[in-house]
Amino acid sequence: MVTSDETVLATTTNKTSITTEPMEPKSSDESTDSETDKIKILKAEQREALTEATGSVEVNGNEENGHVECATVDEVAHVEEDKVEEATNSVVDLSSNGSSATTSVPVEEQEEKANEDETNDVVMETSENGENGKEENGTAMEVAENPAVTENGSKSDGETETDRVAIKDSQEDDSEPVNGSVKPEEKEEKNDTDAPMEEEDQNGKGVKRPVECIQLDDDDDDIQEVSPPVPAKKQKTEETKQEPKQEAKAEPADDNEQAQIRLLDKLQEYVGDQRGQPCNKTRKVLDTLLGAINAQVQKEPLSVRKLILDKVLVLPNTISFPPSQVCDLLIEHDPEMPLAKVINRMFGEERPKLSDSEKRERQQMKQHNPVSHMTKLLVDIGQDLVQETTYCDIVHAKNLPEIPKNIETYKQVAAQLKPVWETLKRKNEPYKLKMSRCGVCGFQTESKLAMAAHKETLHFTGSKFQCTLCKETDTNEQRMKEHYFEAHLIIAKSEEKESKYPCAICEEDFNFKGVREQHYKQCKKDYIRIRNIMMPKQEDHLYLNRWLWERPPVDPSIIQQQQAAALQQAEQKKRHQQALLREQHAQAQAAQLLRKQQLQQQQQAQRLREQQAQAQYRQMAQLIQQQQQQQNRNNANNMSNSLIQAMQAQLRRSGTGTSPQNLNLLQKQMAAVLKNQNPAQIQALVASMNKQTQSPKTPTTPKVAKAAATPTLPLAMSASSSSPGVSFQCEICDQTVHEKDKYLSHLQVLHKQMVGKTLQDMTQGAPLACSRCRDRFWTYEGLERHLVMSHGLVTADLLLKAQKKEDGGRCKTCGKQYAFNMLQHLVADHQVKLCSAEIMYSCDVCAFKCSSYQTLEAHLSSTHPKSADKKKEELITLDD
């Protein structure tokens, strides 16, 4: 093998036998310069011979696919044999012709010393080269030598072995080895076995003695001095060796690159053909790539195999697409490999378990974001940027909210956070863009496109136009545009004028504000109309979704399940409704039965009360009759008879309408009359009982008659002949009272109202009227209660009573009686909205007004006294 470091001439042999003439040892004093000169001459001749042999082998060698075949060169072998013989003979001649004294040094030591003086350049090696001298990327040159070296160039008896001689050139260590050369360690193996014995003698007789094979270091300085290089020959040799080296290097690389280019071209062509063809492949991308590779394997199997072995081409069995706005994750995999196994290989068998907070955060992100994966990606990028900024401030101790108290602890924390900050800094590098700045106006942006568009706009500095790409200035706008086009090939745009009075909707500019306002009114109407027209409806959203997303395939099993679930839900709903109806019907029947029972109980209780009342009346009648019989003897016979007749008529005609209260009242009155025996009282009692007998039932409570409808009668007629069957409902407590005089006494006794009034005053009608509904009332408290319950108006007096916990009474809505907190009950329980009202009292005769009813009464009594021609009516005016 020929390299730039060494030149090897190899011949296969089993034994190495070199016959030389016997040499006599010489002393160191007898060594002359002639021996050194001869050795130099011999080495120069050997180099020339080896160079010529190498050149002939390289010229005549055949190259195929980057490999150089071995050649057997007979001429080189013969030349080398002659050179070796000449070198041996010259050494023998020098040793035999020297005029030195004989010493007792053995023959082996003399030979070793002679070899050292010869610069140790001849190395005898016996090795066999496997693979016929061929390596992976280089070749080895073999030369077979059959003749054995003898003393006069003849063969020794019985020896027909081949010799392998390796001659190393120590002067070529620094040159570059040829591509594919075998390592020097493999070429220069030590021969630890004993050297073959040589048969030599001074008289030509062979004597066997051991010959040592010496391996010398190429880096020995003494050898370099002894054997200087030949510049001319070495340069020529290197030129001849570097040419095949470059060819051997270039060819494999070119082959790989060409194979890759051809494969990529075929892949592109195949994928382009398959992309437009309809197919039923479930793994579109993976099957297309594998089909393209298989098609190329059939055409160039060796090149594709070499790419696979060099790990340039990898056959995929799984292709995964990252999450996007269209899909969460898409994986195409080999059907022989289950999906679970693919996921385990991609993400690992043990998936990280999320904490409760992370699960909650992920669920919230899915609820509030339609594309949660992309949102999570952007959120992570933002969090990393914020963390990097925070950690940078902590590590460099800047922008801190306060000075750290413990400096050592802070330094430890900063040292721990520094690698984390560096990692985040490297991770966030793609998201940090360099700010570009306009040199004319100072505009800054991270986008190069935005900066390019900005620089296309003319910049006016106040007195002249400045080019944004160079230092050109001009006062004329057209000339500056021509400069942009000629110098920079850019069509410049004029700078937009600043808006004076722009429209907020269409951004149209106006010179005057009034014109802008007129335009804005019409523009707003048009904008609202167009927005209502262009507003998408529910059908538009439906059509848009149908256009964006394909309709999923119909699965009969899923439809059947959905239909069965819908039927089951309908049946459950129907059964639930039927159960509700049955329950409601049962509740209605129970309520009806309860009402019947209550009605029966009430009827029975009423009959019982009537029977008791009749028994009491009989007893009273008997008592009265007995007493009257005793008293009739005196002066009251007629009166007692009339009383007895009235009582009997009352007992006979007493019906279901008589209440226990009236019976008790009659009993008390009769007892008092009998005790006092006052004729006037007995006459009045008889008249009242006659009236009650004439009215069998008490009618429902009508409203108080108006003053205009009530005729003005004298006191005697009104007292004796008041309209029968009329009942009054108290405007303060809602209690029903028969007869006007009883109602007056009810107001005076129970409610302490209308004190000092007589029945004649009530004949003129109720004095107080509501300005909202024109209803009339006898008392001020009744008017206040009506305003609150019916109209939600609160007077100042009622508000003062509420503050003092004196706003009691009966609620008209629910009928409950309250000692206080009536207003709070209306607001909380009945949701009545209350507002304040101021009541002004005005005189009907004159224009007098006041806020107090007592003041109005004093005014009427003093200014307008009672007379037959005047009526006393006060009208209330409400100022809300």
From Swiss-Prot:
InterPro entries: Zinc_finger, Znf_C2H2_type. Has a broad role in development, specifically in the genetic pathway SynMuvB that negatively regulates specification of the vulval cell fate. Required for fem-3 3'-UTR-mediated repression in the regulation of the sperm/oocyte switch. Acts by regulating the translation of fem-3 mRNA, by binding to its 3'-UTR. PROSITE patterns: ZINC_FINGER_C2H2_1. Interacts with hda-1, let-418, lin-1, mog-1, mog-4, mog-5, mog-6, pie-1 and unc-98. Residues 1-37, 82-257, 350-370 are annotated as: Disordered. Residues 108-120, 215-224 have a biased composition (Acidic residues). The keyword Repeat applies. The gene is mep-1. This is MOG interacting and ectopic P-granules protein 1. It is found in: Nucleus. Residues 23-37, 154-170, 183-193, 235-252, 350-364 have a biased composition (Basic and acidic residues). Its main location: nucleus.
